[in-house]
């Protein structure tokens, strides 16, 4: 069965205290939490990884993880795609003064054109001094 791991990585990390939380190392070797999650997903049989990111972090994201993960995925015949969450990409009008992304629902909506198989959503969350992740089935 074809399956997709949809990784929400566009958050602004306002509670995280600066920096891009998705790119923060979690061990001495510089791995980030997505490294482990993606490797596990490949072993579980996922065929596609889709990153939901913001356009303004695209280059840094690809430098830190994207290019490396693309090589790992290619070696296992897993495809990688990127979609961009944009605050203006919503049905209807943007409320005056809105500056933050719309969250989970709008992020998944941003990926609608590349989600052609059953998928699992992975969210990376911060809480005070730690980073956690959650899988939504």
Label every PLM stretch briefly:
Residues 13-15, 90, 129:
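Short, acidic Gly/Pro/Ser/Thr-rich loop/turn segments
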Residues 3-4, 31-121:
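Conserved N-terminal catalytic core of the sugar/cofactor nucleotidyltransferase
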Residues 18-21, 93-95:
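Short acidic, glycine/proline-rich loop/turn micro-motifs
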Residues 129-137:
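Conserved donor-nucleotide/metal-binding helix-loop-beta segment in metal-dependent transferases, i.e.
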Residues 24-31:
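Short, glycine-rich nucleotide/cofactor-binding loops
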Residues 1-19:
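N-terminal nucleotide-binding beta1-loop-alpha1 segment
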Residues 9, 27, 53, 123:
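Short beta-strand/turn micro-motifs composed of small residues
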Residues 125-127:
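The conserved acidic donor/metal-binding loop of glycosyltransferases
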């Amino acid at each position: 069965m074809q399956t997709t791991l949809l990784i929400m990585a566009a958050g602004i990390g306002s509670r995280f205290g600066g920096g891009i939380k998705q790119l923060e190392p979690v061990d001495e070797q510089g791995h980030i939490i997505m490294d482990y999650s993606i490797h596990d997903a490949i072993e579980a049989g996922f065929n596609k990884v889709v990153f939901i990111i913001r356009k303004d972090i695209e280059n840094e994201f690809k430098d830190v993880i994207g290019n490396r993960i693309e090589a790992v995925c290619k070696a296992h015949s897993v495809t990688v795609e990127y979609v961009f969450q944009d605050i203006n990409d919503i049905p209807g009008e943007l409320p005056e003064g809105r500056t933050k992304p719309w969250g989970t629902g709008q992020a998944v909506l941003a990926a609608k054109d590349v989600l052609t198989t059953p998928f699992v959503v992975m969210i990376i969350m911060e809480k005070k001094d730690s980073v956690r992740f959650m899988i939504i089935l």
